[in-house]
Amino acid sequence: MSPVSQRSLTLIGAGLAGCLLAILLSRRGWQVTVYERRGDPRIKGYESGRSINLALAERGRHALRQAGAEDAVMAKAVMMRGRMVHPLVGQPQLQRYGRDDSEVIWSIHRAALNVALLDLAEQAGARVHFYRRLHTVDFDAGYARFIDDRDDQPHEIHFQSLIGSDGAGSALRAAMQRKSPLGERTEFLDHSYKELEIPPQPGGGFRIEGNALHIWPRGRYMCIALPNDGGTFTVTLFLPNAGEPSFATTRTGDEAFALFARDFPDALPLIPQLKEHWEEHPPGLLGTLTLDRWHLDGRALLIGDAAHAMVPFHGQGMNCAFEDCVALADQLDAHDDLASAFAAFEAARRDDAAAIQQMALENYLEMRDRVDDPDFLLQRELEQQLQARWPTRFVPHYTMVTFLRTRYSIALARSEIQREILVQATRGHSDLSRIDWSALEAVVHARLEPLDGAH
C-alpha cells in the first residue's frame, strides 16, 4: 500500500489534463514528474491528431480557477453566445445557449491552452520530460521504461505510482491491461470527422459572426465551425463512413468540393483551401471508451480520456477531464494511502463519466437532425418559458451541463424528465398559445425538485 505521505506521483502525458493535474498537485506540495511522448510544443510547434478547437464551459473554468490558471487561459479564448444554424435555404439563425451573455461558452485553441498550462505546471514545480514514450511497466517493482523515438534510446525510472493522462490511446492503459484486464470496450460511431479552416479576412477579423458556434445541420451529417482568437475558424465535417454521402464516396478534393457546393453552399467560398486540406487531413475516428475499473490499487490510475473517452458533440471531454483533476486532488487530500484515494476517485466519478458519455452521443442527434426541426424549436421555446417561470426547478439541460456544475448523472436524470414534459406539453401544438400553464405548473412541481445552484 502506497502511503500518501511520500507525496510523489509520476504522470504519463503532458496534454491538457496532465498539465492541469500537475499544477494542482504541485501547488499542494506533491513532487510531480511528467513524461510526454511528443516534443516540447513551445520549441517545435504543436503536434496532435486531436481537434484543435475546444469548448470551455463553467466546469472547466472552475478547475482552472482552482489551479490559478483561469486568467492566462481566458486571455486566449473567444466567447460563443450560441449556435448559428445555417439551413440549406434561408438565412442563418442564432440559437442562444443561455439567457444572456453571462451564459456563454468559450472557444480555445488546443495548442494555446496546452502551452499555457505547460508553462504554469513548470512554474508550480512540476518536472516535465519530453520525447519519452512509455514502453514497458513493471508494476510490482515500480519500474518503467521509456523510449526516445528520435534515437530509440531507452530511459528507465522508478516510480511510486503512475497516473495516466495520456488520452484515448493511453499507453499506460495498455500496460495496465497486460498486468490485469480492465474490461476495456470501445464503441466506434459509424461516422468520422475531417478538419478544415476558414482563414481571416485579408485585413484581419472573422469572415462570419465570430461569437458563435456555426452549424450546418443536414440530417445524417453536419458541418460545424468554431472561432479562434486569430480570426480563423476551425471547420469540422462529420460524415458517415459508408453510404451517400460518406467518406467512402468523398475521397478526393474535387469530390469534397462538389459535396460542399451541393450541401454547404454558403460555407464553400469561406474555405479556399478545401481541396488541399481534404486530401492532406485523414478522417478522425469517433468513439466511446468504457472500462470496468480505472486503477490498479495504488500503483496506477487513469483519468480523462484515458479512462472514459467520449464523442465530442457536447463539448465536455476537456471539461470532464478537468473535473477529474480537481476530484482526484481532493481525494488525495482526504485519504492516507493512494489505493483508497484512487478507489474513492473512481467511485465519485464513474457514474458522471458514463452520463456525459451518453449525453454526448444524444447531442449529436440533436445537432445534426433537430436544430432546424419545428417540433424541437417549439420545445425549446417552451423550455425557455418554463425556466423563466420556475428557474430553480425547470433548468434546461444545456444550462445544467454547461453553465452550472450539476453532477452529470443528475443532469441526465433531470433532462430525461424535462424532455418528457416538453414533448407531452407541445404534442399537437404549433405554438404556445393553447398551453395549459396551471397543469404544467403542477407537473413541474411534482416531478422536479429545486436544483442547487440554479437561479
Swiss-Prot record:
EC number(s) reported in the record? 1.14.13.9
Q: What class of enzyme is it?
A: oxidoreductase
**Known catalytic reactions:** L-kynurenine + NADPH + O2 + H(+) = 3-hydroxy-L-kynurenine + NADP(+) + H2O
Q: Which GO terms describe its biological process?
A: anthranilate metabolic process; kynurenine metabolic process; L-tryptophan catabolic process; NAD biosynthetic process; quinolinate biosynthetic process
| Cofactors | FAD
Q: Name one GO molecular function term.
A: kynurenine 3-monooxygenase activity
Instruction: Give, as in the UniProt entry, the pathway in which the protein acts.
Output: Cofactor biosynthesis; NAD(+) biosynthesis; quinolinate from L-kynurenine: step 1/3
Keywords linked to the UniProt accession: FAD, Flavoprotein, Monooxygenase, NADP, Oxidoreductase, Pyridine nucleotide biosynthesis
Q: Which InterPro entries match?
A: FAD-bd (IPR002938), FAD/NAD-bd_sf (IPR036188), Kynurenine_monooxygenase (IPR027545)
Function field: Catalyzes the hydroxylation of L-kynurenine (L-Kyn) to form 3-hydroxy-L-kynurenine (L-3OHKyn). Required for synthesis of quinolinic acid.
Q: Which HAMAP family match?
A: Kynurenine_monooxygenase
What family classification does the UniProt entry report for this protein?
Answer: Belongs to the aromatic-ring hydroxylase family. KMO subfamily.
Tell me the protein's name.
Kynurenine 3-monooxygenase
Which gene carries the instructions for this protein?
kmo
